[in-house]
């Protein structure tokens, strides 16, 4: 249409190129190859194509790349260059493999990175904004990322970086654009989500600064379109005079925002990737994909216990023995008194023959292991926090809805081995741990323990501030998948007795 301006945007692709599940090879409507087919249909001379971050981490293909060929340009980076983006933003997970990996990605992705609210070696990493002329109109575009990254990321990965408050940065940038440019439209790419319900404005999470999308929409006048991300939600609408979008993860959706200057209208919509994948992109990565698939099918060892997860709810309610195994490995590796792990969304567990595919489908993040020193008092606070995962509804134990919406956060329910404890869900929050023992003795406030956990939790991720403040004893830089694979290959046959140390009651 003459005069129509089109914005196409991806977010939270998480390393997915191919349209299938790496857990069972089933076909799925995901991946950048399908997104490219959509873009090829929708793109014209009046179109801008943007990516809103979280590209490098997530898929087994990318994990395999960083384990085996980290000095090469990654498949997803080359796929982005093939799709030919105009501008890109960074997300929090793009820092997971370290500074060198991020810089190699940004230097080879084929599009300028315009993230403006973090400093690298003391200097702004990206421009404050960029200007593009599209269909005779002047468009200002800027990118920001959640400033909460230092609360999750390994310090070594961001040691040369400083993050500025995303909201304050957006506010200052919009003022600057208005004063210097007087554009027809302002587009904000924000790798962050919404902290409030978009309908009634009620808080849906603690106001930590992780997500400030609602605050930006409500308070900053002049942004015409905000492309959000991070929470993997499907959203398209208008609030406080600003249009917004957010897409599901793994390349399952594409945001399409059509701007019609002639009648001053904007139409945002979310398109599903239910289309044939682009054959040229699939062909580009045949070798890497085949190598990854062969690696995933390696048998590492066997176990005398069936550790498959068939019901995630039950696996959390009654602590699946796959958690017992993960904790056992962490404890043996670190020598810690206690160990904690969460069952991630979609985790498959292991059959009696354990393959690398089982590992990466069960432990889906590139986390490392940290040992913390805690007191009995801190341990109880920690368990009370994790017990918030449960609630009573119609006299049944159910998952607290805040762990499902606006973003699934099942990874924030930890299960701890090395102690025995009972969660009474009907008790008030903060008073649910009714029994807590260590080696048969009641845990007292002044007792001291070492506890192994992932680096995300060790930095206070999930609002576990009591853990963040606890002293760090040691850090193992091996990924948890690497640690598990080495353990299984060393032992060949994993033989252990099931441990049922957690009781959850009404």
Task: Give the ranges of each region predicted by the language model.
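Glycine-rich phosphate/diphosphate-binding loops and the adjacent beta-loop-alpha structural elements
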Residues: 298-319
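Short, surface-exposed secondary-structure junctions/capping segments
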Residues: 283-287
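Short clusters of hydrophobic/aromatic residues that line enzyme substrate/ligand-binding pockets
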Residues: 17, 303, 307, 359
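Feature captures C-terminal
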Residues: 4-6, 16, 30, 34, ...
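Acidic, glycine-rich low-complexity/disordered segments
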Residues: 289-298
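Intrinsic-disorder/low-complexity loop/linker signature
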Residues: 122, 201, 304-305, 310, ...
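Short, flexible segments with low predicted structural confidence
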Residues: 52, 77, 301-303, 310, ...
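Acidic, metal/ion-coordinating pockets
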Residues: 1-280, 317-323, 328-329, 388, ...
């Amino acid at each position: 249409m003459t005069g129509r301006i089109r914005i196409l945007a991806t977010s939270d692709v998480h390393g997915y190129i191919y349209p299938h599940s790496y857990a069972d090879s089933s076909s799925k409507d995901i991946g950048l190859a399908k997104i490219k087919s959509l873009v090829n249909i929708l793109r014209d001379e009046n179109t801008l194509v943007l990516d809103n971050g979280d590209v490098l981490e997530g898929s087994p293909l990318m994990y395999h790349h960083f384990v085996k060929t980290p000095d090469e340009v990654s498949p997803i980076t080359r796929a982005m260059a093939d799709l030919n983006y105009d501008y890109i933003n960074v997300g929090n997970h793009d820092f997971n493999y370290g500074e060198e990996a991020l810089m190699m990605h940004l230097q080879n992705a084929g599009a300028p990175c315009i993230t403006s609210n973090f400093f690298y070696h003391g200097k702004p990493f990206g421009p404050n904004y960029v200007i593009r002329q599209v269909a005779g109109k002047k468009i200002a575009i800027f990118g920001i990322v959640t400033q909460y990254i230092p609360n999750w990321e390994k310090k070594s990965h961001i040691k040369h970086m400083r993050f500025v408050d995303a909201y304050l940065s957006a506010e200052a940038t919009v003022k600057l654009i208005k004063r210097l440019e007087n554009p027809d439209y302002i587009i904000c790419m924000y790798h962050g989500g919404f902290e409030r319900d978009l309908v009634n404005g009620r808080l849906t999470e603690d106001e930590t600064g992780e997500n400030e999308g609602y605050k930006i929409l409500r308070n900053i006048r002049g942004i015409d379109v905000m492309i959000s991300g991070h929470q993997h939600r499907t959203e398209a609408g208008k609030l406080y005079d600003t249009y917004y979008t957010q897409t599901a993860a793994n390349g399952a959706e594409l945001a399409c925002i059509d701007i019609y200057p002639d009648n001053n209208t904007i139409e945002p919509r979310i398109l599903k990737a239910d289309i044939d994948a682009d054959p040229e992109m699939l062909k580009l990565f045949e070798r890497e994909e085949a190598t990854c698939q062969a690696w995933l099918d390696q048998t590492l060892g066997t176990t005398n216990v069936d550790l498959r997860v068939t019901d995630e709810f039950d696996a959390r309610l009654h602590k699946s023995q796959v958690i017992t195994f993960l904790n056992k490995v962490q404890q043996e590796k670190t020598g810690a008194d206690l160990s904690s792990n969460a069952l991630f969304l979609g985790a498959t567990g292991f059959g009696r023959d354990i393959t690398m595919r089982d590992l990466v489908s069960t432990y889906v993040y590139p986390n490392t292991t940290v040992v913390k020193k805690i007191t009995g008092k801190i341990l109880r606070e920690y368990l009370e926090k994790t017990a918030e995962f449960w609630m009573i509804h119609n006299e049944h134990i159910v998952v607290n809805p805040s762990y499902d919406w606006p973003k699934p956060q099942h990874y924030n329910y930890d299960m701890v081995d090395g102690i025995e404890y009972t969660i009474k869900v009907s008790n008030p929050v903060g008073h649910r741990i009714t029994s807590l023992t260590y080696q048969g003795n009641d845990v007292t406030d002044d007792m001291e323990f070492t506890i192994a956990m992932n680096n995300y939790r060790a930095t206070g991720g999930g609002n576990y501030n009591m853990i963040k403040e606890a002293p760090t004893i040691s850090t193992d830089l091996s990924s948890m998948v690497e640690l598990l694979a080495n353990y299984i290959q060393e032992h060949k046959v994993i033989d252990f007795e099931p441990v049922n140390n957690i009781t959850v009651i009404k």
